[in-house]
Amino acid sequence: MIINFLLNCGSCAATVRAIQIRDVDLGGGVVFYRHTKNRKTQVIPLCSPMIAILREYGRYRGGEPTDYLFCTETGTQLTENGLRQSIARYNTRCGVQKTSIHLFCHTFARKYLIDCGGDAFTLQKLLGHSALATTKHYCAIYDADLTKNYDNFSPLAQMKASGAKIKMAARGR
């Protein structure tokens, strides 16, 4: 459940641990982060599969609006160490060598920007960064990324595909 959430939102551990049931609006398809590093509430969209997963989880979990969304078996807030250990156990069972909650943020950012074609400014807002330079650190670009789907973004390829005539832009005089 938490793995899906991390891959949907790219949240940091402290933010995920602080989410209460009332912070999730499945009808609106968003989650409100009320406890962030910059102390500003963020509104983060949820994709359709995540909404379905959270609906099922809510039916199974129950709870009061002020209860933590992700909690221990006794209903208390997860500790950072408890969350880290749970993720490490899950990743080990799945054969994942590198395990860190923060790597989910990097994975989310890279997938959003490189693999899914999202834009850097929206990603910046989703991650809650005030500077685009901070977001840049989350998105390593490899040589293979430069050629992947390049025809979809090349002005020449787009013009040729649409049958448009290629004209030189006139200089302003």
Feature annotation, model-predicted:
Residues 31-32, 97-100:
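A short linear hydrophobic-aromatic micro-motif
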Residues 48-96:
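Active-site/catalytic core of tyrosine-dependent DNA strand-transfer enzymes
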Residues 35-38, 127, 131-152:
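Catalytic-site neighborhood detector that most strongly recognizes the C-terminal catalytic loop/helix
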Residues 153-173:
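C-terminal secondary-structure termini that scaffold catalytic or DNA-interacting sites
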Residues 9, 76, 97, 116:
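Flexible coil/turn residues that form the inter-helical turn or adjacent wing/linker of helix-turn-helix
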Residues 101-102, 138:
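Catalytic tyrosine of NAD(P)H-dependent dehydrogenase/reductases that use a Tyr as the general acid/base
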Residues 4, 8, 107-130, 137:
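C-terminal catalytic core of tyrosine-transesterase DNA break-rejoin enzymes
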